[in-house]
């Protein structure tokens, strides 16, 4: 999860620089090249034999999808839905408030990303050391809601936008790191691969629906309506996490 967060942060920094140098078409060619490199890396991996084979069936899915794991799947779906929907309009918000030019977005993202990594460390430590993962996740969802409210209502300058973006990234990076860790400790060992597959599918479905719905809302209504949508999703998610059982098969919270 942490590596995914780092990759996303790097894309925010490098993307505007590449597009300013070679244009939007060059940016997509760069993405295609990186995809080919990724495929070569996957093909170069040694195939390891599974410890135990099991037949994929409806019963395997039903046994894997416990209440706890469904909550985690919905959590990663919601996180990436909020991310994708928010960043459909984030560049427009920056331009409308004349914070920085499109080519200089990295001036804003770089300090926010650096500060967010510093801010997430104590949250991760508290979560792991004191077994308070659920409550740290709820705190981070609250921070997501706070950041969306500021983006929605505030008259933004560079300083306020930087602080708000840092709050958003602290919450996002913390959740992105904690959810896969919690999933691996919650799922049964023999069905962990299936659980991780469903989890990853939920993540990318969240990205797809976030981009599609966020773009549709912006097209029909306006920029602020997108943030109202992400706030609505985050509030439902917060209550869903509140109802999540404290005890799981592999992890107990005290």
Residue positions per predicted region:
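Helix-loop-helix hairpin linking two adjacent transmembrane segments in secondary transporters
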Residues: 2-43
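Helix-to-loop junctions at the C-terminal end of transmembrane segments
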Residues: 19, 118-132, 218
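C-terminal membrane-cytosol helix-exit motif in multi-pass small-molecule transporters
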Residues: 32-51, 240-245
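Juxtamembrane intracellular "pre-TM" segments in multi-pass secondary transporters
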Residues: 45-75
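Pair of pore-lining "gating" transmembrane helices in MFS-fold secondary transporters
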Residues: 66-86, 166, 170
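Short amphipathic helix-loop junctions that connect adjacent transmembrane helices
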Residues: 88-104
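C-terminal transmembrane helical hairpin of 12-TM major facilitator-type secondary transporters
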Residues: 133-179
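A late C-terminal transmembrane helix in Major Facilitator Superfamily
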Residues: 186-220
